[in-house]
Curated annotation (Swiss-Prot):
Name this polypeptide is given: Dual specificity mitogen-activated protein kinase kinase 1
Chain positions recorded as U0126 binding sites: K97, D208, F209, G210, V211
Region (RAF1-binding): 270-307
Cellular component annotations (GO), alphabetically ordered: axon; cell cortex; centrosome; ciliary basal body; cytosol; dendrite cytoplasm; early endosome; endoplasmic reticulum
EC numbers, comma separated: 2.7.12.2
Positions annotated as active site in the UniProt record: D190
GO molecular function: ATP binding; MAP kinase kinase activity; MAP-kinase scaffold activity; mitogen-activated protein kinase kinase kinase binding; protein kinase activator activity; protein kinase activity; protein serine kinase activity; protein serine/threonine kinase activator activity
Amino acid sequence: MPKKKPTPIQLNPAPDGSAVNGTSSAETNLEALQKKLEELELDEQQRKRLEAFLTQKQKVGELKDDDFEKISELGAGNGGVVFKVSHKPSGLVMARKLIHLEIKPAIRNQIIRELQVLHECNSPYIVGFYGAFYSDGEISICMEHMDGGSLDQVLKKAGRIPEQILGKVSIAVIKGLTYLREKHKIMHRDVKPSNILVNSRGEIKLCDFGVSGQLIDSMANSFVGTRSYMSPERLQGTHYSVQSDIWSMGLSLVEMAVGRYPIPPPDAKELELMFGCQVEGDAAETPPRPRTPGRPLSSYGMDSRPPMAIFELLDYIVNEPPPKLPSGVFSLEFQDFVNKCLIKNPAERADLKQLMVHAFIKRSDAEEVDFAGWLCSTIGLNQPSTPTHAAGV
């Protein structure tokens, strides 16, 4: 079906003509923003939602520590803690990430400056940004609050995430990565379930991407947990590109489909426990990994093998065959899609354009899936009065 010409985006200047977070000439900025948004292929619903977000954002003005009231903690990770907060002057609920850094003022100012690029990241597949500021030894990054949380939290409640749902997730992640690359020349650098956020309107958005080189450098020591999603070429310290993000997406999809981090791969016994039936395929043929001498036997999900030490895990990613989905429980298209994401040589790995036209994505795009309904029933959220079908996907 041919795409109809998008209606122009309507953004109303803030009543007092005040600038967004300290930028001048609000009206000129709005015109430039309208032009950028019209270049995106948005459907009517996505257009209206982006308009509403940007119109609300204009009322926010400059962000200050005193203007926030803590509601609850949403999670911790990547060197920071995220709180659900109320921005008292505007009445908006936001997510506020606090990153404690012992750094010189010049570095701090550079980080805040680099984070300003986020004001220009406006897409249905990217978490909205209200602003960043520094106070009391902490950098604050204020974002749109996504009431469904992150997919790692959803996975804990769901046990496993169904293939149809993961189809919609895959589309959103590919479109989000494509937007960052094409419009901003940015790589994500940290794709994993905890950086894919969802909400009760059925939206699926990426957060925590590497927009500030200085922030990445300043937080280098806190990235240990993330290494388990890094591509082999990145772990080996060689040149890496957006192809590295595709590996991370593939690994995340296998994790969400089977219900646990997929390295080492589950053996036949564990797969039978997971899926309640005998499962065919290579994943079921993995020989049990010998237990490290002197290490106690501990439970690892349904797997009786002990968890790997980080160095064993990274060695496995670089030197062993990549994970794959067990056959017999997932469609051939989904299995092939994941296999193309998890090719160890980045030059042979599928790129974003190839993935966008893959049979699994085409099928998922055509499927009517009530993502919002599934999410709300899975995590016990109230659904908005106008349910949506995998909004914007």
